[in-house]
């Protein structure tokens, strides 16, 4: 997987215009094939992401060969014929996800910010990706006590590196659903924080 940084072209989306805070990130995500819009001409910047969509994005970043996971269904609610199925199988195999704890993955469930943080950290750590930025933020989100126990370390680790922005000052709004523009911006931040680090690990498989 070669990350493209310079091949910027006008976006085809009528609902994303230059000057939008997420414009560059959406452009970056699109030219690298991480995700597309909701149609050929719309991105739906007010839209949210499902868990299936998000794991698909991670799998595309990793350069997953979907043929290697065809027909694998590690969770009872992930049909083998769905677009996200091979990516979910990849994520389960490599410990990026363990599902909901009841044999399901909830692929159509909206992903919230604490789930996003956990996916990212597991993804980085399972493949030994150095996601340090040189930052050493000593504060924690004011709402850290609202974070689920299984997500606490991931949120703290990303926050410490300056890779998580609060909705308000020092508030991460951890249970808010993860919006598509935010996903694009976080991917942009994570994958451009240190290209020389990322390049050594993509693709993994």
Question: Positions of the model-derived regions?
Answer:
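Feature responds to low-complexity, polar/acidic, surface-exposed segments characteristic
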Residues: 1-23, 31, 36-52, 59-85, ...
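Acidic helix/loop microenvironments that form the catalytic cleft of cell-wall polysaccharide enzymes
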Residues: 178-182
